[in-house]
Amino acid sequence: MREILFKAKRVDNGEWIEGYYAECKGKTFIGIDISIGIDVFEVFCTPVIRWLEVDPETLCQFAGMTDKNGKRIWESDVVWLVYNGEEHIYQIVWDNSELDFKATNGEENYGSNFEYLLCCDEIEVIGNIFDNPELLQEEHK
């Protein structure tokens, strides 16, 4: 079972943060567990969460996989992958009809199940559509 995590850019400084997702009074928040290393947490096992407002347009869910370098793969990431000896640059998207993540270049998809990406020879996160939209253009050159 994959860990349910989200990331988004903070409203106050544009920094990417990872954690838990919530909406309250029309605003979007990511909660960061700041209890690690606190003695009270070790005794009572009660996490201390700091909630930070984020830009909802940048909200991305963890896809449950890591790339060849151990980096988490998120919705809206741009990945470089090798399949059957051919290199591709794809975007990770959520597919509502399949209720799963896909890697797509807008023209074709790699399977209806995100786990099919495990058959790729290599997969590496090289950016995301918010910070590096130009990466998707490279596939079509």
For the regions a protein language model found, what residue spans apply to each?
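Secondary-structure transition motif
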Residues: M1-K141
